[in-house]
């Protein structure tokens, strides 16, 4: 019904079809439902700890693989995971992240500072968004990206991620 309504409205406004003789265009989509293992074990030279899926971490991916498995992967801390030449900032400088998992902080380095012009201060820039961090990690050759959540710089509690990312998501079909 919605498509019929929109098509009727377009015609009544005198708009010409934009896809040959049709007002409609097929948009192939894919549905992805990420599910994490129940545990993630992290080992460091100083010890190890275990994170519980959904309670301590959630996952997300736009990859359409049937299964993505990370086992015995190397983690590399990459600050905020940002390359921003206009701010003379490069968290990846001198880091080898190829085929590793980068761990980055949420938001950007301007948050909580006194300079409102540095990464726009407390106003999150595109560099602070999760999508940018995933894209930059991929550009740097990383296998994946883990974003460390912190409620204050994120602007929302972890429960928002638990509620929103534990469900199916629609993406354009690659």
Please give the residue ranges for each predicted region.
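Short hydrophobic alpha-helical runs that function as membrane-insertion/retention elements
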Residues: 103-104, 144-148
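Acidic glycine-/aspartate-rich tracts in secreted/extracellular proteins
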Residues: 109, 151-152
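Residue-level detector of short, conserved catalytic/binding motifs and their immediate flanks
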Residues: 38, 100, 134, 143-144
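Short, acidic/polar
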Residues: 86-90, 128-135
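Proteins synthesized as precursors that undergo proteolytic processing into mature forms
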Residues: 115-124, 130
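Noncatalytic luminal/extracellular "stalk/propeptide" segments of secretory-pathway proteins
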Residues: 1-115, 157-163, 169-173
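Non-catalytic positions within long, well-ordered alpha-helices that form the structural scaffold/packing
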Residues: 11, 135-139
């Amino acid at each position: 019904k919605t498509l019929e309504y929109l098509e009727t409205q377009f015609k009544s406004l005198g708009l010409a079809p934009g896809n040959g003789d049709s007002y409609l265009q097929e948009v192939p989509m894919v549905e992805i439902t990420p599910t994490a293992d129940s545990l993630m074990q992290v080992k460091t030279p100083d010890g190890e700890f275990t994170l519980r899926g959904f309670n301590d971490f959630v996952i997300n991916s736009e990859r359409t693989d049937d299964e993505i498995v990370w086992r015995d992967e190397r983690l590399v801390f990459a600050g905020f995971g940002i390359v921003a030449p206009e701010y003379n900032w490069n968290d990846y400088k001198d880091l080898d992240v190829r085929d590793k998992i980068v761990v980055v902080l949420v938001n950007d380095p301007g948050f909580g500072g006194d300079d409102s012009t540095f990464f726009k201060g407390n106003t999150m820039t595109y560099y602070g968004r999760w999508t940018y961090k995933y894209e930059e990690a991929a550009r740097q050759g990383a296998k994946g990206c883990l974003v460390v959540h912190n409620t204050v710089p994120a602007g929302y509690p972890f429960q928002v991620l638990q509620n929103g990312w534990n469900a199916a998501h629609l993406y354009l079909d690659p």
